């Protein structure tokens, strides 16, 4: 296990000395502050299958803690026009800490996250690609007793 961490290509894993599935908000904040990271990028898949991005300049710790805890509101009717109507389209993209990585293409030091969709009540959005895939994987495991390692 130590070799997996020491030789890991993700700078967050090697710096924090823990596997990515154990990352916490406090770990991410520590890395951001000590490495002087300037931006966050929230990445999420829209209904059309395209990867979208929301970028945030880190202005202060309070804002950083809020955005990592609560995510950001997005208009679901633009992202999932087939499923959501403009009147009831509040969604939140919440970062999954275990997906954090340094963006190798950004000129500004940036940490990117893959995000999950949640509704205004804090429940996962059932029509999101991630949720559908998760449910399919659970059904597959229940029937076959096998699981997908890529997930």
Regions found by a protein language model. Give the residues of each.
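ATP/Mg2+-dependent ligation/transfer catalytic cores
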Residues: 1-151
